């Protein structure tokens, strides 16, 4: 269900579509409210958002099944607003034990990061304030990365695009081969492909790659986006 393609008038039992397409009134109004018996939502932690709610309220007789690996939202909103019960839970420790996920080895970099002036928004630190608080430590962090992950394929998460771009430059000065990608990058697909193939050994981003991206060769993740 996208662009000029529609399931209406067809005999398909399953329809795949994005919420961005379905939430449009011009498309939604073509359907009878009882058209779907069941709606399955991937990345279901987004189901509370306005777009999903518009679709779910329109098809209000459908059963709803949500699937997500990250049910805990940063704004602390409860998915119980949409889903009545938890059908199945597969925990992180169990997935590691059964070999589906890599065991995590966490290392804390000893920074005396002052977050006292960082404000709060939607239950978490404000990204703009974090940028200011983190900025003086970027060179020190690059030095620590040279100790811990000089030969690893590394993804770095930062609070803002400008911080991500600045840290990319700092890493390149420090001897890494770093790239940066964000939602506005016209060459995003090319950068991701080059990182996957080994052209870059560090990829910086501002929380862009938190879902919908897979790169099994990554063996180090640096989180420079403090959360509560």
Residue ranges of model-derived segments:
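Conserved RecA-like ASCE P-loop NTPase motor core of nucleic-acid helicases/translocases
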Residues: 153-160, 179-181
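Catalytic acidic motif of RecA-like/P-loop NTPases
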Residues: 20, 44-46, 210, 227
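Conserved helix/coil segment N-terminal to the catalytic DExD/H
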Residues: 5-38, 49-54
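Conserved interdomain linker/interface between the two RecA-like ATPase lobes of SF2 helicase motors
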Residues: 86-155
């Amino acid at each position: 269900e996208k662009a000029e393609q529609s399931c209406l008038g067809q005999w398909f039992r399953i329809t795949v579509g994005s919420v961005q397409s379905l939430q449009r009134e011009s498309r939604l109004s073509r359907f009878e409210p009882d058209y779907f018996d069941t709606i399955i939502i991937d990345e279901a932690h987004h189901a509370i958002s306005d777009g999903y709610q518009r679709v779910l309220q329109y098809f209000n007789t459908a059963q709803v099944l949500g699937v997500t690996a990250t049910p805990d939202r940063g704004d602390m909103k409860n998915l119980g607003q949409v889903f009545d019960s938890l059908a199945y839970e597969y925990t992180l420790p169990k997935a590691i034990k059964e070999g589906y996920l890599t065991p995590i080895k966490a290392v804390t970099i000893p920074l005396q990061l002052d977050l006292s002036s960082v404000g709060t928004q939607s239950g978490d630190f404000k990204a703009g304030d974090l940028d200011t608080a983190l900025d003086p430590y970027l060179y020190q962090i690059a030095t620590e990365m040279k100790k811990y992950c000089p030969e690893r394929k590394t993804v770095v998460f930062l609070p803002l695009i400008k911080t991500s771009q600045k840290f990319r430059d700092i890493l390149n000065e420090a001897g890494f081969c770093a790239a940066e990608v964000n939602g506005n990058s016209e060459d995003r697909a090319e950068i991701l492909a080059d990182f996957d193939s080994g052209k870059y050994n560090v990829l910086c981003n501002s929380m862009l790659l938190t879902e919908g991206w897979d790169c099994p060769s990554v063996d180090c993740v640096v989180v420079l986006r403090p959360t509560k």
